[in-house]
Amino acid sequence: LGDVYKRQRRFSKSIKAVVIAFLILLLLIPMFMIEDMISERGRTQTDAIAEVGQKWSLAQTITGPYINLKYPITQEDNGTKKVTMGNVTLLPDELSIDGQLSTEILRRGIYKVNVYQSELVIKGFFSSEELRKSNVDMDVLQYQRAAICLNLTDMRGLSEQVSITLNDSVYMFEPGMDGRGIESMGVHAIVDLSALKDDRKLPYEMKIKLKGSQSIYFTPLGKTTRVALKANWNTPSFDGNYLPEKREITEKDFSAQWQVLNLNRNYPQVFINYQNASIKDIQNSNFGVNLKMPVEQYQQSMRSTKYAILIILLTFTVIFFTEIMEKTRIHALQYLLVGLALCLFYSFCLLYTSPSPRD
């Protein structure tokens, strides 16, 4: 009888272990449902950020200013001469940007979206040195109808008219690029750049008031590009191809300074007609700052649920060995209730970390 009793106990323990394993697999169902709920909340938050960006202004990337010059190209086709216009793009020798960002929080339902208003002072100078090094015939360039171009990601972010002071003359920008820009979105001004032909430097200065959301980036078009940025935000994430040389982050704000040389990037100062490879190099050379929220609650909730199966397994293991050591019987329903309580805990974690309209 003693041997039969021992075999029955070993058999019942094996059955109990199988039942516990089945319960753990069963509890994966509510955990997957909780993970799906967290993912759905995260997607809704992303949609809310995009919706606010569509109404306020999207993340901004500032590319420019740069000069576009037209020149005639004569081709013969069956004895007939055909004249088309080519493009020469001249990037600045020096590009200096001094920016001040004023951030604020907007709401869409229970979600918070960080937006900003910026004041940017852009200055530097152009010269014809790189033009003379290129294979362009300087005499055929149309200096009197040159274009100063500035590309922006979202034109709705402009808060006032934009002008540029170029060699002591003021020019107003017009909407659109008129087919003369590195990218299609932006503004341009038709200017007289005859001074370039005379080997003179062309100093420029412009001020922009620009709205955006989430982040702001800059393109290092200058032979030397310097950017100094300040903002009343204490959790910046510096992003892009270049990190700031100097940075200071306090409890209330941050400041950062970048310096990028033309040797640090993979495109020249002069483009003869636009090439897709060169444009892609320009687009990939951006740098800037992402204004991160202090707490990404759904990301934290998702991380915690990844450990749920491990927590349930360890809890059931402790209970099972306690049952063996103390020689007591714990019903499978009690295991199930403990597991459901752990699942409920993660549901409460999601509820607790979700923002409320009063936050």
Which positions does each model-derived feature cover?
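Soluble non-transmembrane domains of integral membrane proteins
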Residues: D47, Q54, G64, N68, ...
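Alpha-helical transmembrane signal-anchor/signal-peptide segments
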Residues: D36-K55
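Hydrophobic alpha-helical transmembrane signal-anchor segments
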Residues: R10-D36
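Membrane-entry segments of alpha-helical transmembrane domains in multi-pass membrane proteins
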Residues: S14-V18, R107-N114, Q300-Y307
